[in-house]
């Protein structure tokens, strides 16, 4: 992001649009409403005594972060061992590990979630929800609720945790997911209006992964210059006017700030095998011109990292891989959330004889690794 800011200083009309093939739009929109920030909350299940999950596969790809370690710590046998209630429509890894798994249609899951919220706030509830409400009240701050699906479900789960004063909520923010559907739609409007002169696609392929990929392909055709930074000959590669082979991540330098207080560096394990370059190297070349000493991305990375790692030396940070407690800031706190609107939306889902649940298979992801034979051996 620092590099793109420098790039934008050179080219003021440049815009950065983040695209996720598997978006967490509902979760991010809910976080924006409840916490006032578009970042996912970080939870810690260590020491918790009750977790109630509504469609949330929190041992899978839920919330953009992993809870397996703290879940395992809380599940050690003992008087305060974590009790796990899973309410879901399809079988998940998380549901398979639950003490009590309640199988319901999606519309029914929504209604139980609303009733649990109402019950915790003094409202009347059904017999099924009453038992969950009672357990949550007994455990209080040692309980936590997760939900997945719509924005409304996430909002109610956050507000339930606020009501419980759940200790699982750390106040830390997870920055790994950034896709903004509104921003993406704005970008599509720019292309449709002929306002995009150059499009640089950094190893993304919306033509394949987006539900309206064919429409995206037609819009791309309106852009005079399309550059695909790609690792394979995919649909975006075919639509581009120019292609830059991107370096494999095992050949690349980089840094990340995955969550509050954590800064991490990545370094290549091998020299580049082919004539390729990572997007950061390309941005430096486009900023400074060819054969410029300032195009060395390692030097750029080192200079920027030094400002983020506090008193740690760059070599020490590189050796450890992770620097905790650095200058990566951003904390979350409860600042809002419209429970009435969320409840109305969830109750509006009409029950029917057949209801559809769509989910992302963790092992397949967005399908970009479908040419890996191992991924063709999965039972489903």
Language model regions located:
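Non-catalytic, well-ordered alpha-helical segments in soluble enzyme domains
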Residues: 278-306
């Amino acid at each position: 992001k620092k590099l793109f800011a420098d790039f934008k200083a050179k080219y003021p009309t440049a815009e950065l649009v983040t695209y996720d093939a598997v978006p967490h739009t509902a979760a991010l929109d809910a976080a924006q409403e409840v916490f006032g920030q578009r970042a996912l909350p970080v939870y810690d299940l260590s020491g918790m005594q009750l977790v109630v999950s509504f469609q949330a596969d929190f041992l899978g790809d839920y919330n953009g972060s992993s809870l397996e370690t703290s879940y395992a710590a809380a599940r050690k046998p003992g008087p305060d061992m974590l009790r796990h209630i899973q309410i879901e429509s399809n079988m998940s890894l998380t549901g398979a590990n639950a003490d009590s798994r309640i199988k319901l249609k999606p519309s029914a899951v929504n209604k139980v979630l609303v009733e649990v919220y109402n019950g915790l706030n003094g409202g009347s509830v059904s017999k099924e929800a009453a038992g969950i409400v009672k357990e949550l009240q007994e455990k209080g701050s040692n309980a936590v609720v997760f939900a997945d699906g719509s924005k409304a479900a996430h909002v109610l789960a956050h507000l339930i945790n606020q009501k419980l004063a759940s200790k699982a909520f750390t106040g830390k923010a997870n920055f790994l997911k950034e896709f903004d559907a509104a921003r993406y739609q704005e970008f599509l409007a720019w292309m449709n209006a002929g306002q995009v002169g150059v499009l640089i696609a950094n190893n993304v392929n919306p033509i394949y992964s987006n539900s309206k990929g064919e429409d995206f392909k037609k819009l791309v055709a309106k852009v005079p210059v399309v550059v695909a930074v790609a690792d394979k000959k995919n649909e975006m590669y075919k639509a581009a006017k120019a292609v830059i082979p991107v370096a494999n991540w095992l050949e690349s330098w980089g840094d990340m700030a995955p969550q509050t207080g954590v800064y991490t560096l990545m370094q290549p394990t091998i020299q580049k095998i082919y004539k390729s370059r990572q997007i950061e190297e390309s941005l430096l070349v486009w900023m400074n011109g060819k054969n410029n000493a300032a195009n060395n991305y390692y030097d750029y990375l080192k200079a920027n990292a030094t400002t983020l790692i506090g008193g740690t030396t760059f070599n020490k940070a590189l050796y450890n891989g992770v620097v905790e407690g650095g200058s990566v800031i951003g904390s979350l706190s409860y600042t809002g959330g419209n429970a009435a609107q969320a409840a109305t939306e969830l109750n509006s889902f009409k029950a029917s004889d057949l209801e559809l649940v769509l989910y992302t298979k963790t092992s397949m992801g967005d399908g970009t690794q479908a040419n890996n034979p191992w991924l063709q051996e999965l039972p489903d």
